[in-house]
Amino acid sequence: MTRVVAQGTFDLLHPGHVHYLEDAATYGDELHAIVARRTNVTHKPAPILCAEQRRDMVAALTAVDEAHLGHPEDVFVPIQRLDPDVIVLGFDQHHDEADIAAALAERGIDCRVERASGRDPRYEDELLSSGDIVDRILKQRGSDCDGAREGQR
């Protein structure tokens, strides 16, 4: 059985997330999704939803066999525990495949690193980014203060 791991923040679940996880599932027989904890999200604004809610939403997707919370300090701990055959990175994730492969090798984790395909919007106004969803909410519903999105960091 080929075990696949996909990981991400999965905040404000949207069709881009669903596509990523469905694509990742095609790399093997069993898909495990690791949901990042707030403490590990340093490259973009902090998640709006708590980690447990994000995990539960991801777990509800048909493509996902099991969803796990990430480790609060070391992102490689759940990967070591799951011992995957393949890790599939998201289309727009900032990680470099070679860097991830090297970090895995340093920890004695023997698995392939792949990159999921992207997905174009299928209809007008479809949003494939959590940031775009937040921006639309702020635009349509307004904000009590300037820079509300930046304040989430």
Swiss-Prot record:
Its EC number is 2.7.7.2. It catalyses: FMN + ATP + H(+) = FAD + diphosphate. The keyword Flavoprotein applies. Gene3D superfamilies: HUPs. Pfam families: CTP_transf_like. SUPFAM superfamilies: Nucleotidylyl transferase. One of its GO terms (biological process) is FMN metabolic process. Keywords: ATP-binding, FAD, Flavoprotein, FMN, Nucleotide-binding, Nucleotidyltransferase, Transferase. Pathway: Cofactor biosynthesis; FAD biosynthesis; FAD from FMN: step 1/1. Its cofactor is a divalent metal cation. ATP binds at residues 9-10, 14-17, 92. GO terms for molecular function: ATP binding; FMN adenylyltransferase activity. Catalyzes the transfer of the AMP portion of ATP to flavin mononucleotide (FMN) to produce flavin adenine dinucleotide (FAD) coenzyme. Belongs to the archaeal FAD synthase family. Homodimer. This is FAD synthase. It comes from Halorubrum lacusprofundi (strain ATCC 49239 / DSM 5036 / JCM 8891 / ACAM 34).
